[in-house]
């Protein structure tokens, strides 16, 4: 190995003496390739099973699998292509063979090492496309892989993360989760929102949408986050604790998502929180979930979402007069910001009487504010030092979901989208390293 590298260095220095120049980028890449090749050769030697194989090993069926010889398997590692040799055993009882070394090294049913699969999962979930992930693997790791390998590996690891999440959810439902011990948490927030992801046609059969043709083009990803707050800044504004935000989400029913979000909150120490806050927009499913899974929590409708209701109504009242639209919003937003919800509702209903052609739309908005009155007392929440905006989850929908799954020309299956979502939630919750540690356990 040292001889090949020494030869390469001699060639590089000879070329420099002749030309007086050095192409540093080319030298870097050449040396990396040589070092990887040398490392791959050494790793191949390490992966040749030297010790005598056992004549019999236990089989999962309860029988004994008999040694049938050594088998060679190609393996792509972070150092490049290698080969591993391991014992093969066959069970006559269940007619199944096994490579126990494959299981021990986490390379069962794959020719990609754990390190390579970790890299593929990272680029597959974080790059703008699986093809771009393939390009990154070649440039950054010096490894040639196919786009399909990036896609399949990302979906496989994502599906495994999602499966483990479901196991944890079942533990929570059966009250078998380990008790989250630790100090009391001053304030814990749960936020949730939904965002549509474009899907292939077979995932949309029988579903109606908001478009003019009534057909659905997306499926809703329900995303939740949990974070904590222990202090305010010098001006009294609440400050989210650094690195305290974790995410969970999937394309699933509201009932399934409620169990998911409950489990995440419990793992974060919901029962230790001195004040518990649930935040979201005005979607009915959010508040049904809050009352079912987080009874007694402070419920807050996102301030900017509530203001948006006024802007949308103003656009109907003054469709072509921008100045009048703004004046109308400012005169009514004052009541909202001051927590005078009853006055706001009365004002709106007076407008319903005056503008009969829009009475139904105005009454709908009046009912919205009346129904959510306890959730939009913003001066009260601010006095308590609480957040009144759900910017954390809205940013999560844009960055965690939108930036990867809502790009131009993308159409997903539910299975593929949920796998990528699982990986991205895991990574953005800083749990990706823990996941790979658990695979080695």
PLM segments and residue spans:
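Catalytic center-proximal scaffold of phosphoryl-transfer enzymes
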Residues: 1-44, 86-441
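Short glycine-rich, low-complexity/disordered patches
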Residues: 22-26, 45-61
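Sterically constrained small-residue positions within well-ordered secondary structures
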Residues: 50, 66, 82, 181-183, ...
């Amino acid at each position: 190995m040292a001889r090949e590298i020494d030869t390469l260095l001699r060639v590089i220095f000879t070329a420099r003496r002749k030309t007086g120049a050095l192409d540093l980028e080319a030298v870097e890449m050449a040396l990396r390739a040589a070092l990887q090749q040398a490392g791959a050769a050494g790793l191949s030697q390490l992966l040749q099973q030297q010790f005598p194989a056992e004549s019999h090993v236990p089989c999962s069926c309860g029988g004994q699998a008999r040694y049938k010889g050594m088998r060679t398997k190609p393996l792509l590692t972070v150092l490049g292509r290698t080969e591993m040799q391991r014992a093969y055993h066959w069970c006559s009882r269940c007619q199944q063979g096994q490579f126990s070394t494959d299981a021990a090294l986490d390379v069962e049913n794959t020719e990609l090492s754990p390190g390579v699969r970790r890299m593929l999962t990272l680029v597959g979930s974080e790059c703008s496309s699986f093809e771009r992930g393939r390009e990154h693997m070649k440039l950054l790791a010096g490894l040639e892989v196919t786009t399909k390998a990036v896609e399949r590996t990302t979906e496989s690891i994502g599906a495994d993360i999602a499966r483990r999440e479901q196991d944890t959810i079942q533990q929570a439902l059966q009250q078998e989760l380990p008790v989250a011990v630790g100090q009391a948490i001053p304030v814990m927030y749960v936020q949730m929102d939904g965002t549509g992801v474009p899907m292939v046609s077979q995932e949309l059969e029988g579903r109606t949408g908001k478009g003019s043709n009534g057909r659905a083009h997306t499926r809703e990803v329900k995303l939740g986050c949990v974070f904590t707050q222990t202090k305010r800044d010098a001006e009294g504004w609440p400050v989210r604790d650094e690195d305290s935000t974790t995410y969970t989400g999937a394309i699933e029913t509201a009932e399934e998502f409620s169990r998911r979000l409950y489990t995440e909150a419990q793992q974060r120490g919901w029962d230790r929180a001195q004040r518990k806050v649930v935040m979201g927009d005005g979607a009915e499913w959010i508040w049904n979930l809050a009352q079912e899974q987080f009874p007694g929590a402070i419920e807050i409708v996102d301030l900017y979402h509530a203001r948006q209701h006024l802007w949308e109504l103003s656009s109907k009242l003054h469709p072509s007069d921008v100045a009048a639209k703004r004046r109308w919003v400012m005169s009514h937003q004052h009541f909202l910001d001051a927590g005078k919800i009853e006055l706001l509702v009365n004002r709106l209903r007076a407008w319903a009487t005056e503008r009969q052609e829009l009475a139904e739309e105005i009454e709908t908005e009046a009912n919205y504010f009346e129904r959510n009155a306890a959730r939009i007392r913003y001066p009260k929440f601010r006095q308590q030092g609480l957040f009144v905006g759900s910017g954390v989850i809205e940013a999560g929908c844009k960055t965690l979901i939108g930036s990867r799954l809502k790009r131009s020309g993308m159409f997903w299956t539910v299975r593929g989208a949920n796998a990528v979502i699982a990986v991205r939630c895991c990574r953005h919750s800083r749990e990706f390293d823990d996941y790979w540690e658990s695979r080695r356990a």
